[in-house]
Structures are given as structure tokens and as C-alpha cells.
Design a protein with these regions (language model features):
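Second-shell loop/turn segments in exported
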Residues: 23-30, 46-56, 108-112, 149-161, ...
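Bacterial Sec-dependent N-terminal signal peptides
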Residues: 1-24
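N-terminal hydrophobic or amphipathic helices/low-complexity stretches enriched
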Residues: 18-76, 125-126
Length: 328
């Protein structure tokens, strides 16, 4: 009898503990290392052939991401999870640089030297206010294969940017795990063609019918390495200078939730380039960008998953979920 009473007491206390959790804490608790490892190890595997935009590995990656969104219960932004687009290179253009110009496609086709078909992956959790949007995104493409190299020829891109993709997926799941509908529509964006000139995010911005209703964009690009070995918790936190509250949010959440991060806060007056956040900043949309800086394996075949700081990936994902919770 005493044993049964103790068991009943334990179960009651456990139930009270769960019910005492806030919605945001439920979401935060769902973010974990094993999920990050599963996503990154798959995306950075040799089977995906370096995920070059317009080629087989990138196509498989987009299918994988869409299937996970569907499995989680995240709705497609439109009729499909995919936003297809074509990128063109003119005959005399610089090698590796392509363009997306949906308004001048006929003229481009007359001058085209090469065409690559790409597609973004876009999911959404509807908000209470259906007229406003916030976006969290990361590019999923990388550099593919270079047969001219000796030895390892596959650019696996574990940090760049399988790490960012894992964060966006975990944030989507965290919003669902919270059990609370966001105030604004939250779009989960996975960009194709970033390595060829931010093509996917540029296309989205150029064709978006609700661009003026987007209230903020959070970007991930390379969030898993230690640029400074003596500072394993360091992360660069770029944000739009006109929105100093973005810095206040992160400082508050580090204190409140004990996040193991040491941010290098960088407020930017001018639009920030270098990654997909630039496409949004150029049209006046406030941005946040998490980045752990370049390292010796940047854009090298040696950018492998076994070199990542997994604790940092998880802590940045948690911090950015809290950012998005406030932004939404």
C-alpha cells in the first residue's frame, strides 16, 4: 500500500511539473543534440554529393526537408512545399555566377549560356494575425563535387550549411511542441542556390506578394564551429541596428535560461550581405543572423560533421527559437 501511495504521489508531482511548464519552455525542451546530429549527418553524407544547386544531391535534400515538414505537421506555404525557379548564366558572365530575373525571363533566355532548375522549400505555421509574417531560414545547397581534386572530392558542407538547416527544422518542431499558436504567421524557409549568389532568397523576395507584411527575418549560416578555440561558446550575432531590442532579447534569454553562449553583438546600419539575410535587409526588412565565423575547413572538402561543436549548435538553436518566439 505504501509503495502504491509513493508511486501515486510521484506521478501527481510529475504531472504538476509538466503542467507548470510554460508554452515556450515546452518548445525549448524539444530542441536536442540527437535531432541536430541526425539531420546534419544525413545532409553532409557523401551520398548527397555536396548538395550543389541544380543537381541531384540538392534535389534529394529538398525532398528530405519537405518530407520532414510534412511529418511534423507544418503546412506548405502555398499549394506545395516547393518554390521552383530557374537560374541563368549569360555566355560572358563570370564563372559560377548566375541570375534570377523573373520579370525579364524572355530576354535572358535569348542570351542564356546555362540554365539550372532549383527550388526553395517553404513551410508555414499560421498565426492569429494572418496578415503579418516572420521568417526563419537557412540555405541547404553547397558546392558539390570537384573531380579535379586529389583525394576527397566532395564538399560535404556540414557547417556550411547543414548546421543551419538543422536549426530551422528544430525551431519548427519547437513551435509545434509549445502547443501555442503564434501571433504572426511563421515561415520556415530553406533556400536553394545560396552558394551561386543568394539565388533562392533573391527569387523569394523578388516574387513575394506580401513582402511589405514581413516583419522580420532570422538567418542561419554556419553555426557549428569554433573560429576561436579558446572561446568555444562564441557566436557572432548580427542584427539591424535600428532594432536594438534584438540585442536586448538575446541578453535577457541568456540570463533567464542559462544559455551557454558568448555572443559578439554586431549592430549593422547598412544592409548586411554575405548570406541570405542580405536579400531581406536590402528591402528594409529587419534581420538577425547567427554565424560562428569562417574556419580552415570553410569551402573545403574537410567540412565534416565530426568537426562540429554540437553543444554550440544546440544552444544557438535554443537562443534563436526564443528570438522567433518574441518576433512572432
Amino acid at each position: 500500500m505504501k509503495k502504491n501511495i509513493l508511486l501515486l504521489s510521484f506521478l501527481c508531482n510529475f504531472s504538476l511539473l509538466l503542467s507548470a511548464q510554460t508554452n515556450v519552455e515546452k518548445g525549448l525542451q524539444s530542441i536536442n543534440r540527437s535531432s541536430a546530429e541526425a539531420t546534419i549527418n544525413f545532409l553532409a553524407s557523401d551520398e548527397l554529393q555536396g548538395r550543389e544547386a541544380g543537381f541531384h544531391g540538392s534535389r534529394v535534400t529538398s525532398e528530405y526537408i519537405a518530407s520532414l515538414l510534412q511529418w511534423m505537421g507544418v503546412s506548405p506555404l502555398a499549394d506545395s512545399y516547393f518554390q521552383p525557379f530557374d537560374a541563368y548564366r549569360k555566355e560572358r558572365q563570370k564563372k559560377g555566377r548566375l541570375e534570377v530575373h523573373p520579370d525579364s525571363i524572355v530576354k535572358l533566355k535569348q542570351e542564356v549560356h546555362q540554365k539550372l532548375s532549383m527550388r526553395n522549400v517553404l513551410g508555414m505555421i499560421p498565426g492569429k494575425n494572418t496578415k503579418e509574417y516572420v521568417i526563419v531560414g537557412a540555405h541547404f545547397d553547397h558546392l558539390g563535387i570537384d573531380p579535379a581534386l586529389d583525394g576527397d572530392q566532395i564538399y560535404n558542407g556540414a557547417d556550411d550549411n547543414a548546421s543551419g538547416v538543422s536549426a530551422v527544422l528544430q525551431i519548427a518542431r519547437a513551435f509545434l511542441a509549445s502547443g501555442q499558436q503564434p501571433e504572426r504567421n511563421v515561415i520556415f524557409a530553406f533556400w536553394d542556390g545560396e552558394e551561386k549568389g543568394l539565388l533562392g532568397s533573391k527569387y523569394f523576395v523578388q516574387t513575394c506578394p506580401f513582402l511589405s507584411q514581413i516583419k522580420g527575418y532570422l538567418n542561419f549560416d554556419m553555426i557549428g564551429r569554433n573560429n576561436k578555440p579558446q572561446q568555444p561558446k562564441q557566436v557572432v550575432y548580427f542584427y539591424t541596428a535600428a532594432h536594438p531590442v534584438f540585442e536586448d532579447w538575446l541578453k535577457e534569454d541568456i540570463r533567464k535560461y542559462g544559455l551557454q553562449l558568448e555572443p559578439d553583438y554586431r549592430a549593422w546600419e547598412n544592409p548586411i550581405g554575405g548570406s541570405d539575410n542580405g536579400s531581406f535587409a536590402k528591402v528594409g526588412i529587419p534581420i538577425i543572423w547567427y554565424h560562428t565565423d569562417e574556419h580552415p575547413d570553410y569551402h573545403q572538402p574537410s567540412d565534416h560533421a565530426d568537426r562540429l561543436n554540437w553543444d554550440k549548435v544546440v544552444e544557438i538553436t535554443k537562443a534563436s527559437f526564443l528570438n522567433m518566439w518574441k518576433m512572432a
